[in-house]
Amino acid sequence: MNITIVLGDKIPSIKYGGTQRVMWYLGKELHKRGHKVTFIAGKGSSCPFAKVIELDPSVNLNTQIPTDADIVHFNIPVPEGITKPHLLTIHGNGIPANADRNIVFVSRNHAQRLGSESFVYNGLDWDDYGPANLTLSRKNYHFLGKAAWKVKNIKGAITVVQSIKNAQLDVLGGYRLNLKMGFRFTWNPRIHFHGMVDDSKKKVIIEQSKGLIFPVTWHEPFGLAITESLYFGAPVFGTPYGALPELVSPEVGFLTAHGQEMAEHIQSAQYSPKVCHEYARDLFNSSVMAEAYLKKYETILNGEPLNKEVPHIIDIARRLPWD
């Protein structure tokens, strides 16, 4: 099958870029299965296993799609007048105005909140991450995500760690001084800011972490921070919003909207790094994801829509409770 994957940004992603990372691994897995993959992606993109067409925003996107494409997998709004079989994966909490019925979301909760039952969990190629060292001593906790986004609730994560005697927090994805969202300065010797980190540094820190503190105050569509942390043996302590109840089972973490309850649980609970690792490795890998997307492609190529109706926003609540 000739499959074209359309992205708005450059591939590969080096430090951050969840959509690019997931779609890169999808393309890689499809290539391994014998499919011909073409990426349409941002300026400067390159790929060793697929043809790359540089996205030209000044030209009608329909004219940039290869004529031999059997199906087009969009990750940006579908252009008007599209005639090729296609689908759109929605990665955020919104829907384009021109949406049709061939839409895929990234978790069950994500789909249901946007009027759909069609979803595929994000998967990663764990071989790229290398083997997880599950025997290291675990000392600090970590936060992984764009700390500047208020809904990621870095303040909540810091408060939880501060309430645990001698606990320290490694912040991956944030800075002690942040001027982008107004003046924010965090001074606490127990909180360590690492900025945007690459995969190797991320691995070193999480393999020595007692757990991911993830008290988001919005409906997280998926959360690669969760599956990456679990893969490296770190349990997840988060809020019961969005996809988290689907991703975090009791054997690999704990969910609550109350900071004190989270802190108390963290101090008394014990989790197996091996169980966390195997859980993420087996359930959220790129092979499982590719298999699910191939079923979606087959449905569309058989002339059937992925949704009975055009998805629409049902619940997009922001700033959910946290105390």
Give each language-model segment a name:
Residues 181-200:
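Nucleotide-activated donor-binding/catalytic signature segment of Leloir-type glycosyltransferases, i.e.
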